[in-house]
């Protein structure tokens, strides 16, 4: 099976000024092709170091995919260094040169000489058209290696890879095994606990393989299988998925790239259930999250951020007696907040967040203590307590996700 290495060229990547999202995209695409990516390399705009990286990559990878360094400036050196390494000439590509000329002519501007560099390619390479920019891409087979050169901007790189580079890679792959992956998403269990529960599967299984990753207050499990056919690979993945569900299905909330909040929002839209929120602990984060999704105005009627005792009483109409006797960090306060916001906004569901974000304690409660209230029309209002750590912003994000999980659990059960 062919192995690939992705080489990102650009000092700005090493300085942390730009995130290397290109590598993640290409890796996902190659995985679907059954081509394994074993190495990601980032190198600055330095000729000596780039040449060293090329030599190292050739010794361990069949396919070398470069991103960046194809532009018009002096530090765009990728094709120059690779051409010299392969002892090949640089030649002009007519299509891209005409495209650049037409651009400047149509705007009555004079093209500087350095812009012509974007239309220069390595001889004997297949030109990859840049439909959204000027820098030509290249695909080259030489000395039992495949070299793919792509521009750095993702808006240019992604369509070039998808439309031109990937079909060429697939045409060369021949009898490559099919690689099938499935992403499972869990909430309410830590990565270490989940990994321990699945340890026998993780250690003993070779095909499929199982990997766990800690996400943003969640755990992601990836199952990956290889086989000669897609049907066989899917069967292998399915068998492992069913065993994981048997053990940890309680904590599963979804699959693939769909977030918990997106999933719950879709469920609310499908059921045509309206919702409102009263927030203290989370200070509007829940409302900001649910408002991200298209069509949300059909079900999200509004909410309130009542951070102080005074606003809880004056705006949200929480009973002064409840606050005096039970405190704002209490089940009683959370319930009243949820019920009142639902009543005031005239919604089917009201959710509330009140607690101690941290790092200091409040009313004798340690940092990270939170009560989430859930009021649903026709059902008894409930309040749920959780105790997190001392990291204030981490606690707030986790509470928002916890709120969506509570809504999902209710919708699943009713």
Curated annotation (Swiss-Prot):
Belongs to the CinA family. The gene is cinA. It holds the Pfam family MoCF_biosynth. This is Putative competence-damage inducible protein. Coiled coil: none annotated. InterPro entries: CinA, CinA-like_C, CinA_C, CinA_KH, Competence-induced_CinA, MoaB/Mog-like_dom_sf, MoaB/Mog_dom. It comes from the Bacteria.
């Amino acid at each position: 099976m062919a192995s690939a290495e992705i080489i990102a060229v650009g000092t700005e990547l090493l300085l942390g000024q730009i995130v290397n999202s290109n590598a993640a995209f290409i890796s996902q695409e190659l995985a679907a092709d059954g081509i394994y990516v074993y190495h990601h390399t980032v190198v600055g705009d330095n000729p000596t170091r780039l040449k060293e990286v090329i030599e190292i990559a050739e010794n361990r990878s069949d396919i070398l995919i470069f991103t960046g360094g194809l532009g018009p400036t002096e530090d765009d050196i990728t094709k120059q260094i690779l051409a010299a390494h392969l002892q090949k000439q640089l030649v002009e590509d007519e299509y891209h040169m005409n495209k650049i000329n037409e651009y400047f002519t149509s705007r009555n501007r004079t093209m500087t000489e350095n812009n012509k560099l974007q239309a220069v390619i390595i001889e004997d390479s297949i030109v990859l058209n840049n439909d959204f920019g000027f820098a030509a891409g290249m695909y080259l087979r030489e000395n039992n290696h495949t070299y793919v050169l792509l521009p750095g901007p993702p808006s240019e790189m992604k369509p070039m890879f998808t439309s031109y580079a990937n079909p060429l890679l697939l045409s060369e792959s021949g009898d490559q095994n099919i690689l099938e992956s499935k992403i499972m998403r869990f909430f309410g269990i830590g990565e270490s606990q989940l990994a321990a529960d699945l340890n026998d599967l993780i250690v003993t299984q070779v095909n499929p393989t199982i990997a766990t990753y800690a996400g943003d207050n969640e755990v992601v499990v990836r199952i990956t299988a290889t086989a000669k056919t897609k049907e066989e690979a899917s069967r292998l993945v399915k068998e492992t998925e069913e065993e994981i569900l048997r053990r940890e299905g309680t904590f599963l909330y979804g699959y693939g790239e769909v977030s918990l909040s997106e999933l719950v929002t879709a469920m609310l839209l499908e059921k045509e259930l309206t919702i409102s929120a009263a927030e203290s602990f989370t200070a509007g984060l829940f409302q900001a999250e649910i408002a991200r999704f298209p069509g949300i105005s059909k079900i999200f009627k509004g909410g309130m951020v009542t951070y102080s005792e005074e606003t809880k009483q004056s705006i949200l109409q929480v009973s002064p007696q409840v606050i005096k006797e039970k405190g704002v960090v209490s089940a009683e306060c959370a319930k009243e907040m949820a019920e009142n916001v639902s009543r005031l906004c005239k919604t089917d569901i009201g959710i509330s967040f009140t607690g101690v974000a941290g790092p200091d304690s409040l009313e004798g409660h340690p940092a990270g203590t939170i009560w989430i209230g859930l009021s649903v029309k026709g059902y008894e209002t409930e309040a749920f307590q959780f105790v997190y750590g001392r990291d204030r912003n981490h606690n707030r994000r986790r509470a928002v996700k916890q709120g969506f999980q509570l809504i999902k659990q209710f919708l699943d059960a009713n």
